[in-house]
């Protein structure tokens, strides 16, 4: 049997780089999941060990699938529904019967639009859309990213011919959306019909360790930005979806918008990334976006 040709030096270096990257990503995912679940246990109610282990495994699985795709989705995914175009009469009927308000997804800290793949797929099945994924430099300040979001929303409205968009935000993305909607100078020209925040720390996170980026300090409890947000009543219909056992945003009350005029929906036991892949969460989001506008 003929022996395999030896690898070139370049191929060996490439394989070594891929292996090292895989180990680094795997290690980072493991540290994130195990560390955050351990911290969560100090601030939320106890539950069965088997349920905790199942949710930990689910969070590891989802992180393991989505995080290696992060670099790719800096280039892909501006039109999120392009991946899930429904074919046939049933799909076309659903889309024609649905409201044509565009949906803009706003990702969270250290993430990009890849995290919305599951939710975009679920919403596309209901005929909602068109859907756009907004990427922003997460290391920049929340205020500057709110200005970027405003420009992106204006571009989507111009592209689609719609007067408004619906925002669907995860984690820090919800704070960026609230910052944009809280600015009195923007209110007259605001192009947002409805806003959904999912696992967003509206009252800040408990974590007191190091955080990267210019906007990181605004994520902490008691930050000036979050205190300013708390003083503003929401002028757009808003829904906050949060988990009883979010490994990043806890206790659950820190995600509430009820006191500001929003609506809260609580789901049981989902972790910070896996909440975006929950059929129940997708159902809540779709129902809210389909509600008739207040008169």
Task: Tell what function each PLM region has.
Residues 152-156, 284-295:
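C-terminal alpha-helix
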Residues 99-101, 232-238, 259-263:
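Short, proline-enriched alpha-helix->beta-strand connector loops that line the catalytic pocket
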Residues 146, 276-291:
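Post-His helix in hydrolase/transferase enzymes
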């Amino acid at each position: 049997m003929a022996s395999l040709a030896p690898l070139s030096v370049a191929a060996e270096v490439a394989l070594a780089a891929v292996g090292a990257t895989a180990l680094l990503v795997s290690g980072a995912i493991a540290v994130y999941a195990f560390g955050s679940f351990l911290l969560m246990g100090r601030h939320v109610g106890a539950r069965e060990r088997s349920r905790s282990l199942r949710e930990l495994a689910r969070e590891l699985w989802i992180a393991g699938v989505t995080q290696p795709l992060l670099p790719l989705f800096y280039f892909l995914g501006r039109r999120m529904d392009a991946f899930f175009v429904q074919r046939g009469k049933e799909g076309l009927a659903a889309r024609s019967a649905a409201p044509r308000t565009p949906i803009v997804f706003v990702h969270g800290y250290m993430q990009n639009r890849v995290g919305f793949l599951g939710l975009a797929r679920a919403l596309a099945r209901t005929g909602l859309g068109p859907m756009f994924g907004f990427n922003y430099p997460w290391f920049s300040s929340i205020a500057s990213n709110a200005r970027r979001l405003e420009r992106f929303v204006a571009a989507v409205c111009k592209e689609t011919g719609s007067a408004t968009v619906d925002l669907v935000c995860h984690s820090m993305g919800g704070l960026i959306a609230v910052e944009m909607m809280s600015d009195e100078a923007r209110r007259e020209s605001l192009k947002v019909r409805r806003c959904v925040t999912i696992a967003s720390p509206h009252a800040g996170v408990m974590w007191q360790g190091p955080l990267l980026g210019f906007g990181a300090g605004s994520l902490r409890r008691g930050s000036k930005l979050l205190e300013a947000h708390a003083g503003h009543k929401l002028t757009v219909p808003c829904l906050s979806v949060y988990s009883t056992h979010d490994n990043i945003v806890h206790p659950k009350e820190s995600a509430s918008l009820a006191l500001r005029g929003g609506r809260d929906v609580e789901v049981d036991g989902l972790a910070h990334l896996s909440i975006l892949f929950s059929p129940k969460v997708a159902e809540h989001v779709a129902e809210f976006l389909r509600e008739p506008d207040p008169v």
